[in-house]
Design a protein with these regions (language model features):
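Cytosolic catalytic domains that perform sulfur/thiol-centered chemistry
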Residues: 1-88, 92-219
Length: 219
């Protein structure tokens, strides 16, 4: 297996560790239509120039007249500047739109922590420099309770150590598929991952042409 030290970095967004404000938003089944609607009311109101980050969570972030919904957690201090989201079960379910992941990144989120994720959304996060972490619901609830008591205390998500740390709480460990972990640590895009194995592919092709020449003599 290749070590991180021997593999060159890619040109994609990477994630090693991040420290920031965590926001507790434990609503279950938040789908991509809520995270990033395709045709939201703000666009109908002539506000098409808003960034993805400004449109993120539009259906629950804004009221019918386009003003902020004061009850929404991310419209409250200090969560306006949150960069870590404590989310509910099945976060990011629904359609495959990549803008759900890029919108969260544009808002400022670097890590989403939830009991489970929509599969396509989960993979889109890795492609866009956002770290999705799966933890038990009870652990997330405990973290959310602690955040609510001390909202301005920052949380650290460390991908190198596979730990989440916060003052007053014991370190929480998490596991991640090795390929996806390396992809974020090294900032590898899909093409970067493929090209890492180009040498092995060339060696295989040369040997296979000797073993099965009839496969390559079809013209």
């Amino acid at each position: 297996m290749r070590s991180l030290q021997t593999v060159s970095r890619g040109e994609g967004p990477s994630f090693i560790s991040h420290t920031g404000i965590a926001a507790p938003f434990l609503r279950p089944n938040v789908d991509t239509d809520i995270i990033m609607p395709l045709n939201g009311r703000l666009a109908l109101m002539g506000r098409e120039s808003l960034s993805e980050g400004e449109r993120c969570f539009e259906p629950i972030r804004y009221l019918a007249d386009g003003s902020e919904n004061p009850a929404f957690i991310l419209n409250q201090e200090p969560y306006r500047t949150a960069s870590i989201l404590l989310a509910g079960d099945n976060f990011g379910t629904g359609s495959s739109r990549e803008s759900a992941a890029t919108g969260l990144r544009d808002f400022g989120f670097r890590s989403i922590i939830a009991p489970s994720f929509g599969e396509i959304f989960y993979n889109n996060c890795f492609a866009n420099g956002v770290l999705p972490v799966v933890l038990d619901a009870e652990v997330i609830q405990h973290m959310a309770d602690q955040v609510a008591r001390n909202p301005e205390v920052e949380t650290k998500v460390d991908l190198e150590e596979n730990h989440i740390r916060r003052p007053g709480l014991a370190a929480v460990s998490f596991s991640l598929d090795a390929r996806l972990r390396n992809k974020l640590l090294l900032g590898l895009r899909d093409l970067d991952e493929i090209l890492r194995y180009r040498g092995e592919a060339d060696v295989f092709l040369e040997g296979d042409q000797v073993r099965r020449p009839w496969v390559y003599n079809w013209h």
